[in-house]
Amino acid sequence: MSDILDEIVIEDVVANCPQEFLQYHKCIRDNEENPGKCKDGRMILSTCIREKVPSVKSIMSECSEPMKKYDQCIRDNMGTRTINENCLGFLQDLRKCAELQVKNKNIKPSINGVNLELIKD
């Protein structure tokens, strides 16, 4: 389900924040040596995602506890290079919660209420 979760969220982002997504990724492509130049685009895309992407809004709302624990683990282990070892369990808990949100709410990428899966077929 992890790959499916990633695909659903990415499709949802592209569907609901297309300009922001394209502008940010174009900036990254054009500034491979210095991706820091794309900070503004990253912030604009992040804001759009938080405000307009249904799957992300649901995950952020319903999975705030595992998200906080994972974030705290990253902060606590940033200087020790042990993030993978110490935080993997928190990441797995967060992904399980996110998968449940997508699965239980039957979230599928859509634009203005039109299910994109219907368009693909």
UniProtKB/Swiss-Prot annotation:
Gene3D superfamilies: 1.10.287.2900
UniProt motif (Cx9C motif 1) ranges: 17-27
InterPro entries: CHCH_domain-containing_protein, CX9C, Mix14
Listed transmembrane segments: none
Keywords from the UniProt entry: Disulfide bond, Mitochondrion, Repeat
Cellular location(s): Mitochondrion intermembrane space
Species this protein is from: Saccharomyces cerevisiae (strain ATCC 204508 / S288c)
Protein name, as recorded: Mitochondrial intermembrane space cysteine motif-containing protein MIX14
Pfam family, one: CX9C
Disulfide bonds: 17-48, 27-38, 63-97, 73-87
GO biological process: aerobic respiration; cellular respiration
Cellular component terms (Gene Ontology): cytoplasm; mitochondrial intermembrane space; mitochondrion; nucleus
Sequence motif Cx9C motif 3, location on chain: 63-73
Top-level taxon: Eukaryota
Short sequence motif named Cx9C motif 2, residue ranges: 38-48
